[in-house]
Amino acid sequence: MKKSLLAVAVAGAVLLSSAVQAQTTPEGYQLQQVLMMSRHNLRAPLANNGSVLAQSTPNAWPAWDVPGGQLTTKGGVLEVYMGHYTREWLVAQGLIPSGECPAPDTVYAYANSLQRTVATAQFFITGAFPGCDIPVHHQEKMGTMDPTFNPVITDDSAAFRQQAVQAMEKARSQLHLDESYKLLEQITHYQDSPSCKEKHQCSLIDAKDTFSANYQQEPGVQGPLKVGNSLVDAFTLQYYEGFPMDQVAWGGIHTDRQWKVLSKLKNGYQDSLFTSPTVARNVAAPLVKYIDKVLVADRVSAPKVTVLVGHDSNIASLLTALDFKPYQLHDQYERTPIGGQLVFQRWHDGNANRDLMKIEYVYQSARQLRNAEALTLKSPAQRVTLELKGCPVDANGFCPLDKFDNVMNTAAK
């Protein structure tokens, strides 16, 4: 079943018409280099006995067909579609040729060394370049975090730990989550959960969060924010996977507004842990340095296309570390959606003989993910232009490359 489903997805992606119109770009502009920082695609939640999920409801969790945390079959299909769409876009911009494999060393794929990230990269390459010999690079030891993608605290001083915890507490204090917790308690029947009956923890609203910023560990939190994130993450993954709606959160989510209220918990968890400047600049430093090397220091010799696959924590901390302006993603509840990509694009304006940078968030809408909609330039992924505070964009979303270089050089120090 899995193999046939994926075979259909790959074949369908290849057969979809490539005679489509490109996104309009100013006359004389030529795309020269692209770096995509992607979040892995659809995975199964962690619902082991004794986990946060099992402790938070008397209800039984639906079964998944892969172990917790691993990329699902549908996640592979979705990533094939994203790869195919990206290939169409790259061809339309003239960066790679149509109908043939890219020249050697044109495309470089690098993923964190977990199953869901490596598999995501493999499916993306299959969708973008079917039949082409393009390896996915990763650490040899699977199941361990690659330092480039590992968002851990690297400052072991007590002063930094205190600053980081205070920054996370401040970010949490700016969130208004009571309505979200109330709805979550109703959906999970939290009053009847093991947490309430056995541990006497019966109110997510009244409980307190405790943050940590320990050396060589990810920023952490214990308390209702962690519980809320775990539960809403599981509901979101069920929705994307295509579970019947009476099985998604046991049929407890009926409206778009309820999704938005619940998603405040997941987004708030990420914002609290990974988007304060103090924490983000520290945990994203290895990734910032890698991107600076590819897009700035070594750009003349770098591959035309670089594909990086990591996690939502990588994207969230990177957005803060580089000081992007606030953004809104339409048709999505997540701030850093499953399978979504930050797409850095280096362009040359031949008319004015100048180099430019454009950065977009490219992602699948919640509906596209649930319905497994094939992506083409005629039925595209969603695209939202992002702006760095240090590199103001023009009406078409482009900023001067020298200003982008300054942003990267400062962030990579």
Curated annotation (Swiss-Prot):
<feature type="binding site">
    <location>
        <position position="116"/>
    </location>
    <ligand>
        <name>substrate</name>
    </ligand>
</feature>
<keyword id="KW-0732">Signal</keyword>
<feature type="signal peptide">
    <location>
        <begin position="1"/>
        <end position="22"/>
    </location>
</feature>
<feature type="binding site">
    <location>
        <position position="43"/>
    </location>
    <ligand>
        <name>substrate</name>
    </ligand>
</feature>
<feature type="active site" description="Nucleophile">
    <location>
        <position position="40"/>
    </location>
</feature>
<comment type="similarity">
    <text>Belongs to the histidine acid phosphatase family.</text>
</comment>
<feature type="active site" description="Proton donor">
    <location>
        <position position="312"/>
    </location>
</feature>
<keyword id="KW-0378">Hydrolase</keyword>
<dbReference type="InterPro" id="IPR029033">
    <property type="entry name" value="His_PPase_superfam"/>
</dbReference>
<dbReference type="GO" id="GO:0030288">
    <property type="term" value="C:outer membrane-bounded periplasmic space"/>
</dbReference>
<feature type="binding site">
    <location>
        <position position="39"/>
    </location>
    <ligand>
        <name>substrate</name>
    </ligand>
</feature>
<keyword id="KW-0574">Periplasm</keyword>
<dbReference type="GO" id="GO:0050308">
    <property type="term" value="F:sugar-phosphatase activity"/>
</dbReference>
<dbReference type="GO" id="GO:0008877">
    <property type="term" value="F:glucose-1-phosphatase activity"/>
</dbReference>
<dbReference type="InterPro" id="IPR033379">
    <property type="entry name" value="Acid_Pase_AS"/>
</dbReference>
<dbReference type="InterPro" id="IPR000560">
    <property type="entry name" value="His_Pase_clade-2"/>
</dbReference>
<feature type="binding site">
    <location>
        <position position="218"/>
    </location>
    <ligand>
        <name>substrate</name>
    </ligand>
</feature>
<dbReference type="InterPro" id="IPR050645">
    <property type="entry name" value="Histidine_acid_phosphatase"/>
</dbReference>
<dbReference type="Pfam" id="PF00328">
    <property type="entry name" value="His_Phos_2"/>
</dbReference>
<comment type="subunit">
    <text>Homodimer.</text>
</comment>
<protein>
    <recommendedName>
        <fullName>Glucose-1-phosphatase</fullName>
        <ecNumber>3.1.3.10</ecNumber>
    </recommendedName>
</protein>
